[in-house]
Swiss-Prot record:
GO terms for biological process: behavioral response to cocaine; cellular response to cocaine; DNA-templated transcription; intracellular signal transduction; locomotory behavior; negative regulation of female receptivity; response to amphetamine; response to morphine. Keywords: Acetylation, Cytoplasm, Phosphoprotein, Protein phosphatase inhibitor. The modification N-acetylmethionine is found at M1. It comes from Homo sapiens (Human). This is Protein phosphatase 1 regulatory subunit 1B.
Length: 204
C-alpha cells in the first residue's frame, strides 16, 4: 500500500464541560500542584516552619500533605546542631588527650617506683652504645686498611723469598734452545718421520 492511500488518524478530543464557572476552573487549576511547586516542597521542607501564603492558598489537602515529613528526604542539620556536634567532638578529644597523659604519668610513676630508669637515662645509654659501636667500626676499618697495605708490600715476595728476574741467557744457550725447539716435534711424534722438503726436480 502506498503511503498516500493510508487513512489519516483523527483524534477526537472531548470539549471541556461548559457547566463549570470560570471561577471554579481557576480554583481547580490553583489546587493542582505544578512541578515547580512540588520541587519547592520537597526541597528541605520542615514541618516546624510556617507554610508560605502560596501554600496556604493551594488548598487544605495539599497543606496537610506538606506537613507530613518525607522519611526518604534528607534533612540537613541546622547550624546550631552542627556547632553543638563540633563542640562535643572537641571536648571528647581534649578529654581523651588528658586521660592519656594522666595514664602515661601514672605508668611512669609506677615504673620509677619499681626501679626502672627514666626515658632520659635510657636515651643517654643508647647514645653511649651507639658511640662505642661507631668507634669499634672505625677501628675495624683501620685494621682492614693496614692489612691491605701490608699485602701490597708483600705481593712481590714469593714463597721462599723475594722474587728475582732470571739471568739473561747466553748466545750458545739460545742457539741450543732453538735446536731443542726444532728437534722437539720429531721427538714428540715418534713413529712419524719429520717432514722434509722434497728435492726439486732437475730441469725445472
Amino acid at each position: 500500500m502506498d503511503p498516500k492511500d493510508r487513512k489519516k488518524i483523527q483524534f477526537s478530543v472531548p470539549a471541556p464541560p461548559s457547566q463549570l464557572d470560570p471561577r471554579q476552573v481557576e480554583m481547580i487549576r490553583r489546587r493542582r500542584p505544578t512541578p515547580a511547586m512540588l520541587f519547592r516542597l520537597s526541597e528541605h521542607s520542615s514541618p516546624e516552619e510556617e507554610a508560605s501564603p502560596h501554600q496556604r492558598a493551594s488548598g487544605e489537602g495539599h497543606h496537610l500533605k506538606s506537613k507530613r515529613p518525607n522519611p526518604c528526604a534528607y534533612t540537613p542539620p541546622s547550624l546550631k546542631a552542627v556547632q553543638r556536634i563540633a563542640e562535643s567532638h572537641l571536648q571528647s578529644i581534649s578529654n581523651l588527650n588528658e586521660n592519656q597523659a594522666s595514664e602515661e604519668e601514672d605508668e611512669l610513676g609506677e615504673l620509677r617506683e619499681l626501679g626502672y630508669p627514666r626515658e632520659e637515662d635510657e636515651e643517654e645509654e643508647e647514645d653511649d652504645e651507639e658511640e662505642e659501636e661507631e668507634e669499634d667500626s672505625q677501628a675495624e676499618v683501620l685494621k682492614v686498611i693496614r692489612q691491605s697495605a701490608g699485602q701490597k708490600t708483600t705481593c712481590g715476595q714469593g714463597l721462599e723469598g723475594p722474587w728475582e728476574r732470571p739471568p739473561p741467557l747466553d748466545e750458545s744457550e739460545r742457539d741450543g734452545g732453538s735446536e731443542d725447539q726444532v728437534e722437539d716435534p720429531a721427538l714428540s711424534e715418534p713413529g712419524e718421520e719429520p717432514q722434509r722438503p722434497s728435492p726439486s726436480e732437475p730441469g725445472t
